[in-house]
Every structure is written in structure tokens, then in C-alpha cells.
Amino acid sequence: MLYNQKYYNLATAKADTAKKIQEAVKSVKDELNGNSDMKCVGIAYEKDDLKEIKDFASFIRNNFKHTVVMGIGGSSLGAMTLLSMSKEKNVTVLESIDSNTVKELFESLDLANTAFLTVSKSGKTIECISQTLIVMKMVEDKLGRDAIGKHFFFLTENKESPITNLAKEFNIKTFEHHKTVGGRYSYLSNTGLIPACIGGLDIEAIRQGAIDTIEYVLNTPNNDILNTCGSIVDFTNNGVDANVVMPYIDRFINLTKWYRQLWAESLGKGGRGTIPVDALGTSDQHSQLQLYMDGPRNKFYTFIYKDKDPNSLKITKTYNEGFEYLKGLSLDDIMNIEFESTVEVLVKRELPVRVIKFKEINEKALSQCLMQFMLETIICGKATGIDPFGQQAVEERKILAREMMANLKK
């Protein structure tokens, strides 16, 4: 693994909890090679789809200067998290339907050199369909109707839907969305890998990183990740109802958003669930740390940081003797001191803390971490009798929203 983990104030799981964790692991193993919901994990071992993804990404990179991915939630957050590794910044993921945000982006684009990828598993996601229809009209007005089929690409299920009908009308190339891999669990599918590959990332390394974690978690007896699952279950049963993830790495801000959806939507069911809290060091030391240190003792903490970069910017001149204590320090020195002091004060208060320290940050390392969080979520769900897949409650809101929109036009 390309990161190390340390744990503080985590008790050994109770015997019955440990048994349930092992039963959950067995369930994951049994389902891994099938075509069930566990395909989101098993897909890590697939290779046949990679050529199509790489060929398409190469076509896009050779024919367009920029790509806009239109999706929301699980159709966007995985891609956004992976793209945090990209140095090219040639892909924008548009989640918002805030009129100002959408207008500013679309009006800033060189439409003739921009590709648009719409991602909707159902083909009916209101937000990304709305974005798509608006920018289609802009492309038609500026470049002509025939340009729509050249600039737009769809990723959706292979079934009749409004979006597949639109694709047929305009001859839009369409990729098949995996039927059993959806939403928050889809970063290893073409939903995550197409944008990542367009962004110049190594998609084989992304899949291999996931495999590394799967093999470790499922085949290493009494490993620390499974022990953590047991601790989380016991903490939850004893009143811990908030799950804080706080990286001291700016590029991981999208990881925390992805994790927030993963944890909340998977385990918030039947009157149960813990609240995921996304934070970022050091800024949220100045907004949330007071609560962590002196508020309710109801939180489990995961802090993420990295080894110091020898090329980190250094303070070589202080200009005032009052700042002499900073001379010679790098920004990474200061960041790590801020991190270590935060962890230490929480540990001293006997609060449950996990620390993940990356040796290096790249596609493989990130994917190892993402798969760890996915497996932890699935295993904790199975061990507590919660189905970690599906999100039946939110379907009610989607149906209501469509009814309200239809009524608005009457």
C-alpha cells in the first residue's frame, strides 16, 4: 500500500461485532465475481473495456482542447476525485444548475474546440439533462445543427430513454453505462475512467490500486482495515453519530465530497446512519476544531496527510525578528506541524482518531484509498443489517420534482 495508517483510542471490536464483520467479508467474497451490486468492486479486475476508453480519450484529446462532463452526484464525484490527480486541467466537471455558474462556464468556452460528455445512468437525471439541452442549443446556434453529433457524447444505460432517443436523432456516440455499477460506487467504471483518461491519467494504475486494496482487505486475516470497521460499528452502537474526514491535502477536497455521498447514501437508512463531515486542514482548524475538542464526544476522525515534499516552498527571509522562528521552514513543515498538533490534542482527549499518511500521491495511491473507503462502507453496512446499495428514499423526491415541473408548465 502506498500509505500507512495509525489508530488512536480505538478499542478492539466486541466478539459479536467481529463475527459480523467476518460474515460481511464472506458475503463480499461470495458476491465478488457475480453480476450483483458487488460488481462495483469486481470491476477492478476487468481489462476488456480499457481499450475502448483509451481510444475514445485519445480521440477527444486529439480533436478538442477542452471537455465538459455533465453529471451530478455519483455520476460526477468519482471523476472529480480522480481528476484531482491531473495536471492538464483540460476537463471540467459541471455539477451545478445554478444559472450564474452554468452561464459563466458555457459563455467562457470556445465551443468549436469543446467536447461535451453527458453522464446519466437512467437517462433522465434532471440536472445534467437540463445542462445538456441548454448547451446543445448554444452549439447549434453557433456551429450549426450538424455539430451536435460531433461535439456531444452520452454515457447511459443501453435501454430506450429520452437521452438514447436524442442520441439517435443527432447521431451522438453513446457509451453503455454498467447496469449494476451505479452512482457513488462507479469510479472504477467508464463513468470515472473516461474523464480520467481524457485528463491524461493512468487508468490501469487506477484499477490496480483498487485490486491492491481488495486483496489486502479480503485476504489478510485480522487486518487493520477490518479492525477499523469493527470499531466503527461499535462506536456507532454507543452514540458516535458523526464521521469526520479531514485531509491536509488541498487536492483531496473532492475526495471528501465523494466520501460524504458514499457514506451518507449507503448507510443512512431505516432511521439509522452517521453523519459524514467533510473538512480540510488547515482552514477548518479555524472553523470546526473548537467543536471537535470541546463539543460532544460523538465523532470518529480520519485525518489524511502526506510525506513532506523536499521541493516545498521555503521561507528564506523573514524581514522582521518577530518571524525568525519561521526562517528555514517549508510550507510542508508548517502544514505537518499543524496536522500533528491537531491530532495530538484530539488523542489527548481520548477521542477515536485514524491517521492515513501517503508516501506518495498518484493515481494508484488514490485508488487504493478510494477502494478502502468503499469496502469499509459496504462491510459496515452488511455487518449492521443495512443494504449499502440503493437509495430508495431519494427516489420519492425525484418523482415529486418531475411532477412539480410538469405542473409548472400547465
Describe each region flagged by the PLM.
Residues 1-58, 317-326:
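Extended, charge-enriched "interface" segments that sit outside catalytic cores
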Residues 45-61, 224-235:
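A short, well-structured juxtamembrane/interface segment
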Residues 58-220, 399, 403:
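Glycine-rich phosphate-binding loops that contact phosphosugars or nucleotide phosphates
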Residues 69, 116-118, 154, 245, ...:
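Structural beta-sheet core signal
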Residues 82-90, 138-141, 262-273, 345-349:
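Short helix-loop-beta junction
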Residues 92-95, 125, 153, 157, ...:
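Hydrophobic alpha-helical scaffolding
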Residues 201-203, 215-345:
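Acidic catalytic cores of enzymes that act on phosphate-bearing nucleotides/polynucleotides
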Residues 386-410:
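C-terminal amphipathic alpha-helical interaction region
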